[in-house]
Structures are given as C-alpha cells and as structure tokens.
Amino acid sequence: MTDILIDDTATEAVRTLIRAFPLVPVSQPPEQGSYLLAEHDTVSLRLVGEKSNVIVDFTSGAAQYRRTKGGGELIAKAVNHTAHPTVWDATAGLGRDSFVLASLGLTVTAFEQHPAVACLLSDGIRRALLNPETQDTAARINLHFGNAAEQMPALVKTQGKPDIVYLDPMYPERRKSAAVKKEMAYFHRLVGEAQDEVVLLHTARQTAKKRVVVKRPRLGEHLAGQAPAYQYTGKSTRFDVYLPYGADKG
C-alpha cells in the first residue's frame, strides 16, 4: 500500500476524498520510494529525493491544449465517436484518454485498480468538476476503483454491455519530452507490474458490444500476441481494434 502524508493545509474536500482509498497515513515522508502528498486542494505523487511531482490536472497544460486546440482525432476514429458509443476505459491510469473521450461528448466509465493512482485521478476529476471550462467533460467520467477484469462482468449484469472497451496497457515511453519521461518513470515505479494482458483482453472481448480498442506504440507488439481485426495508425501511436467474441468483421 502507498503512504500518504497529509499536510495541515489539506482542505476538508481532499481529506474526505483520500478516505475512500486504502492508503497509509504517515507523519513524514518515507526514507525512499514514492508517496502521496495531500496539501491545500491537491493530491500529488512525490518521489523521495526529487523536487518535481505528478498531479492530475485537466484544466491546464497538455489537457487544456487538447481540449481547446483539438487533438484526439485518431482515438475518435478508433472508437467511432460519431455514433456516440458508451465507453469503458479498463486501464484509466492518470485519466488522459478518459478525459479526451469525455471531451468528445462520450460517457466514460473508468477503472483503475491501484489505490494511489485512483486517488490521484479522483482528485483530478474533483477539481475539474469545480472549473466551469471542464465541469461538463468531467461529469461524463465515472470512476470505479478496482480491477477492471474482475469488475466488468458484474457491472454488465446491472448496466448492460458498453459499446466500447478501451485498453491502454503500460508500455515503455519513447520519443517523449523529459517531463513526460519523468512523470511516466514515477508512474511505472509506483504501479509496478501491469495487469495480465491475456485476461484483460479476453474479458474486454467478452464485455464489449461493438469493439475493443487497444492503444499501442506505432511499432509495438500486439497485445497478448493477438492480431487485431484492423488498425488506426498515427505518427507515434496506433489503435488496434478487436471484435467481441462471435462478432463478424466490419
């Protein structure tokens, strides 16, 4: 479990949020490794010995640029956003793709199994809901804390199948800025091993009504060694599309 240092400046909203996750409150930073810091109105991920931190902020930086200047055209095609599909993001992480999908007007159910990452994402969504420019988009994201492969079958029984299951399993980041590389290094160190790819893809294909969309590096291997039905390829990223079991290609 992840340590969290709660500063005296932490707001009541932040204190309430972090109680929803199995984190270990500490009175001082650990001697090594990563930990969460709750201060003022934000939860951040820190690495002992480093000055920089990681927060989920949908109101500025790259998220703001993609929201105001466009972006996400390839992912929009991959999920066929003009059909207004429901999307379950089974590997939400820090929520970037969930936010892009929600900014396209889609309703997104996001799953994150790591308590610290889920806490960071929940905090980012909470703050986005308070910003007039992002509140409508953030309201379309429903975060579930837990393992998607375990939770999706039960959720299907109560909500029905989603049109799309979206997967973005961890892979080595290449040709990224120094800041992005450092952020991903923090993230990978915190999360450790990725989910079982075979189980994840199998469950996704059982769950999706129309398609499973998998984000990969342009030259990366197929997820779980399984070839997709078709692909959407960009300069550095591609989206592999798998059909649900029993579906015809098309």
UniProtKB/Swiss-Prot annotation:
It is found in: Cytoplasm. Pfam families: SAM_MT. It catalyses: guanosine(1516) in 16S rRNA + S-adenosyl-L-methionine = N(2)-methylguanosine(1516) in 16S rRNA + S-adenosyl-L-homocysteine + H(+). Its EC number is 2.1.1.242. InterPro entries: 16SrRNA_methylTrfase_J, SAM-dependent_MTases_sf. Keywords: Cytoplasm, Methyltransferase, rRNA processing, S-adenosyl-L-methionine, Transferase. One of its GO terms (cellular component) is cytoplasm. It comes from the Bacteria. The keyword rRNA processing applies. GO terms for molecular function: rRNA (guanine-N2-)-methyltransferase activity. S-adenosyl-L-methionine binds at residues 96-97, 168. Belongs to the methyltransferase superfamily. RsmJ family. HAMAP family: 16SrRNA_methyltr_J (MF_01523). Specifically methylates the guanosine in position 1516 of 16S rRNA. This is Ribosomal RNA small subunit methyltransferase J. It comes from Neisseria gonorrhoeae.
